[in-house]
Amino acid sequence: MQKPPLLLRRPLPPKFTKLSLHEKKTHTAKTGKIESLHVAFTEDETTSIKMDRTRFPDVLRNQSLTPINIQNIFLDHCVQERVTAISSPQKSTKHVREQIPDTATGSIFFPHCNSASTRIFGKQTNKMESSRKFKTMKDVYTEKRLENILILSSKFSKPKSTPGSVIAQKLEKMHPKHQPLPESPGYTYQHISRDLSATVPSPPPMTVSMKPEGQWPEHFKSTATLTLRVTEFPGFVSLPTPVLPRKPHRQSVIETLVTENGNIESVPKQIPPRPPEGLTKTEKIESEIHVVRGEGFKTVAATRYETITAMTNLAIVNCQVYGRNALNLKGFFILNCPDLTPLAFQLIYLNLSFNDLHYFPTEILCLKNLQILKLRNNPIKEIPSEIQQLEFLRIFTIAFNLITVLPIGLFSLSYLEELDVSYNELTFIPNEIQKLRSLEKLTVDGNELSFFPHGILKLNLTKIQFENNFTHPCFWRDNYLNNPQQLTQIISLFIVQNKLHKFYDKIPVEVQKLLKCTSRCEWCHGPKFGEGFRVIRSCDIFGASQLPVMFYVCSPSCYRRIKESSFVLDGSPSRRIALDVELSKEL
């Protein structure tokens, strides 16, 4: 026998009161800020709600939403359940924009399912709605709480006035969206809900005793019932880190350094692994072939001067190892010069300025190829004549010392080009300076000089500096005052100039000693006995003006001639040096 085809439609619902034909009013809710409500829901909670005949449209959300799986929908059945409903008297519906309070926790569910009567008579209702003209609704903004919204929570105590009971059984889960309907009307419905646990912390749940409720009254039995069960719920949700107050850059750097230092101190010291005990003696000898052993100076236990001495010795070793020809020990404040014999044929430059050397360092004399020597700012009082051993010395600086006399050996340096003896205690310069025929620059500032010797006119100087001395013309008169000559000196000069000693065959020994000429006249270049007569003449030479030059002459006649002369010969007939006649007449 052929079975009639199954009808795939729902059974007719019980009779309802006649629906009014007025236009269905819709509720629209827009929220700009999520605020906390009083109740929330979690997993495995079954709740039902009384569905209004009006339906709620989707609510706009800016964040990701969690789907809710509705297991079964029982139509016109009385089931024991726990109901949480927030109801309010019906008012005229408009587009409503609500503010959700900040205390809202858990999840908020906005129903999107139509009532049973709407689903059954949906076609007729749609026709009636299409025949009516759509009216624009005004937007209304309110600060009141949202109404007609279901709030579900796993731990929630409903008010005593709300009818309902706890459901004792769990319904089966149905995953496919399109399946034949079973005897008990049920289907799977994906709905969008809002999870606020990621942004707002949940307060502790309220503990209110729940009492089982009795059966629903008759006027509630005609309502549609929704049984919800959450199957998918977000797992662990990380809360955003609180925004700390802004710190100044300097404070942040200090805290970072303190943290790093604490981490360094907390790190345990690494103990090097011990070598295996099974190594033989031959292996130890082979491993020690490439080991470099030496001793370094320790500044912790040593004094300051010992440290400085070690540094100077290290500098000498570096010059010796790397073949350096210059050694700079400037500003070490050493008391004694280190041993320079390892660099005897290597160094050509040595700087010992700004130290505490009280004596001229004789260790320098071993440097055979030394060309530049600087001893500036040391308390040296004397230069030894042995300095002539530095044959190739070209530049010699010994300024800001305590030198009183220039040795004769200094004028034996035939290659000397620059001589700086400024700011010492020199009272005169020997006439032997004329031997320095290579000298080009002479600096004698800050001494006690009143004049220069006659021999300086024989040099080929390009520059001379003599500031801060007693060379002004007002000091000349005190320096060239002459004493009368002795009678023996006058007679000796007369005998020698007239060659009278040749007329005598035998001359006493004492007279022979008196007739021996010890010096020459700087004007006539004849013999001069005794000190002679002194005279200062001003010269404009070597780029300087009024350079005072002292002349020692043999007789009053030479004294008168040099005073009246406008030039002087430097020993060679081809060279004449102009003299300032007017200045000499004033004196």
From Swiss-Prot:
Keyword Magnesium carried by entry: no
Q: Where are the LRR repeats?
A: 251-274, 344-367, 368-390, 392-413, 414-436, 437-459, 487-510
Output the SMART domains linked to this UniProt entry: LRR_TYP
Kindly give the Pfam families that the UniProt entry links to this protein: LRR_14
Is the keyword Repeat assigned to this protein?
A: yes
Q: Which domain of life is it from?
A: Eukaryota
Disulfide feature: none
Gene3D superfamilies for the chain = Ribonuclease Inhibitor
Q: Write out the entry's keywords from A to Z.
A: Leucine-rich repeat, Repeat
**One Gene Ontology biological process:** intracellular signal transduction
Matching SUPFAM superfamilies = RNI-like (SSF52047)
Name assigned to this protein: Leucine-rich repeat-containing protein 63
Ranked from the top, the taxonomy reads: Eukaryota, Metazoa, Chordata, Craniata, Vertebrata
This protein's encoding gene: LRRC63
